[in-house]
C-alpha cells in the first residue's frame, strides 16, 4: 500500500577557466499510498540548490593564446605587449593579493536561508556568480468514482529564490589586456582608505512563489464519446530586489536610489 523513493546528488567542480567552479545539490523524495481500490495519493518534493561562477565577457585572443593570435591574418594588435594567461584569464573571476584579501569582510546572499560568510575561494573575487534554488512540492489524488468516471487532482507549490551578482558603483579598472576588467586590488584598497565603498558587488535577487490546483474529471458517456472537464487555478507572487553582496573592503555604501534606503543612506551588507 505504501511505496517510498528518494535520491540525493552532490556536484562540485573547478571548471575550465578561473572562477567557473560549481557547487550544487539535487534532491528528490516521493511517496505513493493506496488508501483503497478507489483512492490513491502521491506526494513528491524535489529541488536543486546550486551556485556557480560565470565567465561572461570576451577577452582578447592574445591573452588566451598568443601564438594562435599571431597566426591570424586579420589580427592587427601588437600581441607582444598583451600578457598571456591562458586558462587563468577571466573577465569575471579575478585573483586578489593576500594584502587585499585581508581587508575583505563577508559576502551575503540568500537561497531560502541567508548566507553570510567567506567567498567560495579566499583569494578569488567572482564578479558574476549565479545562485538559485527552485523547489517544487505536489500532492496528487486519484479517485476512481466508478467504471466510467474518475477524478484526478493535484495541489502544488513552486518556489524560487536566488539571483546573480555583478558590480555596482564606481570600480577601479585594469586595461593591461587591452579590454578592461575590474582591478579588484585597487578597488579594495580604495574602499578601505575611504571607509565608504565607491564600488561594490550587488545581488540581483529573484524571489517567487506559485500555488496551484489542477483538477480534471473524466467521464465516458459511451464507447464513442469521452468527456473531460477541469479547473486550473494558480496564484503567483514574484519580485525583484537588488541588495549589497560585498562591500569590497569598505564599511558601508551610500545608497539613494530606493525607497527602502536608510535615513542616512548608509547601506550595509544585505541591505537593498
Regions found by a protein language model. Give the residues of each.
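Sequence-level detector for tyrosine residue identity
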Residues: 9, 16-17, 25-27, 33, ...
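Arginine residue identity/basic-tract feature
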Residues: 10, 40, 51, 58, ...
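Short glycine/proline-enriched coil/turn segments at helix->beta-strand junctions
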Residues: 37, 104-107, 147, 222-223
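Solvent-exposed loop segments that connect transmembrane elements
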Residues: 55-121, 167-201, 247-272
Amino acid at each position: 500500500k505504501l511505496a517510498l523513493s528518494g535520491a540525493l546528488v552532490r556536484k562540485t567542480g573547478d571548471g575550465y577557466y578561473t572562477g567557473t567552479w560549481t557547487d550544487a545539490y539535487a534532491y528528490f523524495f516521493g511517496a505513493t499510498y493506496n488508501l483503497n481500490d478507489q483512492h490513491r495519493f502521491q506526494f513528491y518534493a524535489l529541488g536543486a540548490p546550486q551556485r556557480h561562477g560565470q565567465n561572461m565577457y570576451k577577452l582578447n585572443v592574445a591573452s588566451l593564446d598568443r601564438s594562435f593570435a599571431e597566426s591570424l591574418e586579420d589580427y592587427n594588435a601588437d600581441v607582444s605587449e598583451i600578457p598571456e594567461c591562458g586558462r587563468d584569464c577571466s573577465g569575471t573571476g579575478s585573483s586578489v593579493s593576500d594584502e587585499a584579501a585581508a581587508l575583505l569582510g563577508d559576502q551575503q546572499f540568500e537561497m531560502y536561508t541567508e548566507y553570510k560568510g567567506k567567498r567560495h575561494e579566499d583569494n578569488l573575487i567572482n564578479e558574476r556568480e549565479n545562485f538559485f534554488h527552485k523547489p517544487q512540492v505536489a500532492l496528487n489524488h486519484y479517485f476512481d468514482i466508478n467504471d466510467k468516471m474518475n477524478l484526478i487532482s493535484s495541489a502544488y507549490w513552486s518556489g524560487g529564490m536566488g539571483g546573480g551578482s555583478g558590480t555596482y558603483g564606481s570600480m577601479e579598472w585594469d586595461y593591461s589586456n587591452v579590454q578592461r576588467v575590474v582591478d579588484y586590488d585597487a578597488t579594495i584598497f580604495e574602499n578601505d582608505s575611504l571607509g565608504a565603498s565607491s564600488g561594490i558587488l550587488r545581488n540581483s535577487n529573484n524571489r517567487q512563489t506559485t500555488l496551484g490546483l489542477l483538477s480534471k474529471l473524466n467521464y465516458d458517456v459511451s464507447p464513442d464519446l469521452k468527456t473531460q472537464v477541469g479547473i486550473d487555478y494558480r496564484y503567483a507572487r514574484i519580485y525583484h530586489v537588488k541588495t549589497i553582496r560585498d562591500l569590497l573592503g569598505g564599511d558601508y555604501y551610500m545608497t539613494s536610489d530606493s525607497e527602502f534606503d536608510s535615513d542616512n543612506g548608509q547601506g550595509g551588507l544585505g541591505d537593498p
